[in-house]
Amino acid sequence: MTTRKNTAKNLLLGYLKEQGITARNSKVGVNFEYDGWNFLLWHDAEEPKFFRLTLPGIFDVTDENYAQALMACNTLNWRYKVVKASLYEYEDEGKRRASVWVCFEQMLDDGIQRQEVVERAVNALVEAAEQFQNLLT
């Protein structure tokens, strides 16, 4: 049984509060900024113990750099076990756009320590985002 206390959202909010980091609720989850990076925890009411922390929009994809961005995503996905990179397509002001997102996913169990999972996720995402940028140079 999932209690309100042991959800991914509450785990993250508890950690951010302990660290003095301000969080903002959005339609899709919880946003926060850390060390110059903007993070988003997707909240899934169907799976409240599914921890999906993302770094959205780390790279804008265009027709000209699409193949290079896709190959860099594939390379990251082979190198990292829990962090995955993907091209995310969206509509902005009536125009179709795409960007690269990196995502850390983990199912939470009742014994998990919030500091451990959040710090591991944040560090892995930042490392992967920096590695992605290096692959493009």
Pin down the residues of each PLM region.
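A conserved amphipathic terminal alpha-helix motif
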Residues: V118-T137
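Charge-rich, low-complexity N-terminal segments
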Residues: M1-E46, V82-Y88
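Long, continuous compositionally biased terminal/linker segments
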Residues: G36-A67
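Generic alpha-helical secondary structure
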Residues: K5, K9, Y66-A69, V118
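Generic recognition of long tandem-repeat/solenoid scaffolds
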Residues: V28-Y34, L53, A98-V102
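A short acidic/glycine-rich loop-to-helix N-cap element
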Residues: L108-A121
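Short, internal acidic amphipathic alpha-helical interface segments
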Residues: L55-C103
